[in-house]
């Protein structure tokens, strides 16, 4: 297995035929992120069983010691069913990892991966043409006391020693559509409320009360249903759970994103894909970071919905108490917004430039708060693009990102709907943790 790694300080390293271990001098942080293609992971797990009878779980543990959770990203056409951690369907790839390592929380991300045509080392395929470019993101921590628990729709793994938990919650809206409506809540609002109550109940029970980063996949996020846009329904359900669980709605809130999976609706208007929420949380709190170029999301005016989004622009986490580790920076989904207004309507490249300016502003603010300094070149990016069929546009976005962050930029591109219908691109990022890519 050929592995390209970057340490927590952003320095490139090379590892060949070696496990992606979270220990040793390369890891200056409590976390490591590994991005691995589906084909490479299948070869790693399958090859192990054929060469000496090693089980898939043993092969996975040897290659990814300290794995605390994973996301299955970009499997095109994952459709109707996703129960717990296992995705099903003709094109679903979740079972590869779910079957081999059933104890590992696995979050489904129902978004097609896009590959810019000129990316060095990437498959030269046209985005949207149906090629299989699915992959996994695996989070590792430096812990050997990991414990896994499955509780209905919630699957989580945690370490008492590291004070960390990774969890995945997958809920089908159809289950909430069948329930009697209360306070005129739409099924998505009720599902979101339920998901976040599960999340907060878990964190309080583990005495790891601080969510660091939350990822939300919301089907048909821009669709108007039940008298309101579905993103606004999601925000209402999320904030309702924050209030019910006595969580602050402003200031010290987690980094987060909410992106829309692109899929069909049933005849009853219910998405065929689930609401999926996955998260990293800790016993120690993170430092919330805002962007001086933007109004804080939790202070957005009512024109964006009766309930404001509940997230910080970024969160900087320094690890377990007394660990003396470098800060990990989680940057929320960031877009072409100045103040609270969308700018550069209809121009995706101008929106990309504005988004990069916002990311740079977040890094500057993080440095002012004592975290970093980080540069754009230090970041690992995830880029969500609304138009997944325009190969030339995707290549131009990739060129802009490389111009801003350097030729060796680490970026994963996904086809997704963005939370505002006039936003054409959203970029999230992280830094301060080691990164490895297996392709």
What are the roles of these predicted feature ranges?
Residues 2-439:
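N-terminal presequence-like segments and the immediate start of the first folded domain
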């Amino acid at each position: 297995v050929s592995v390209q790694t970057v340490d927590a300080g952003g320095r490139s390293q090379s590892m060949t035929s070696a496990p992606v271990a979270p220990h040793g001098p390369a890891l200056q942080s409590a976390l490591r992120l590994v991005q691995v293609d589906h084909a490479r992971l299948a070869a790693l797990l399958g090859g192990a069983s054929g060469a000496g009878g090693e089980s898939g779980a043993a092969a996975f543990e040897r290659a990814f010691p300290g794995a605390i959770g994973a996301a299955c990203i970009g499997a095109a056409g994952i459709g109707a069913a996703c129960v717990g951690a296992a995705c099903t369907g003709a094109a679903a790839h979740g079972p590869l990892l779910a079957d081999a390592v059933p104890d590992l929380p696995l979050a489904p991300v129902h978004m097609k991966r896009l590959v810019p045509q000129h990316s060095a080392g990437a498959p030269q395929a046209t985005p949207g043409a149906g090629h299989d470019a699915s992959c996994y993101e695996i989070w590792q921590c430096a812990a050997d006391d990991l414990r896994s628990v499955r509780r209905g729709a919630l699957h989580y793994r945690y370490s008492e020693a590291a004070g960390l938990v990774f969890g995945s919650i997958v809920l089908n809206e159809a289950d909430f559509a069948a329930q009697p409506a209360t306070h005129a809540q739409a099924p998505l609002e009720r599902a979101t409320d339920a998901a976040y109550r599960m999340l907060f109940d878990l964190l309080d029970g583990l005495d790891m009360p601080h969510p660091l980063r939350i990822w939300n996949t919301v089907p048909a996020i821009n669709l108007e249903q039940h008298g309101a846009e579905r993103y606004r329904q999601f925000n209402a359900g999320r904030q309702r759970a924050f209030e019910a669980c006595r969580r602050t709605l402003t200031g010290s809130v987690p980094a987060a994103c909410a992106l829309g999976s692109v899929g069909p609706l049933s005849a009853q208007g219910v998405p065929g894909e689930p609401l999926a929420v996955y998260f990293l949380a800790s016993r120690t709190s993170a430092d919330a970071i805002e962007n001086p170029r933007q109004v804080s999301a939790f202070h957005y005016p009512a024109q964006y919905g009766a309930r404001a989004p509940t997230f910080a622009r970024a969160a900087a986490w320094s690890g377990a108490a007394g660990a003396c580790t470098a800060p990990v920076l989680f940057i929320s989904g960031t877009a072409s917004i100045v103040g609270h207004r969308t700018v550069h309507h209809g121009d995706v490249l101008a929106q990309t430039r504005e988004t990069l300016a916002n990311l740079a502003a977040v890094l500057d603010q993080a440095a002012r708060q004592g975290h970093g300094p980080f540069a754009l070149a230090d970041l690992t990016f995830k880029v969500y693009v609304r138009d997944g069929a325009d190969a030339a546009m995707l290549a131009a976005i990739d060129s802009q990102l490389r111009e801003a962050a350097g030729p060796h930029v680490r970026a994963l591109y996904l086809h997704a709907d963005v939370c505002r219908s006039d936003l054409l691109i959203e970029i999230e990022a992280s830094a301060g943790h080691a990164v490895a890519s297996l392709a």
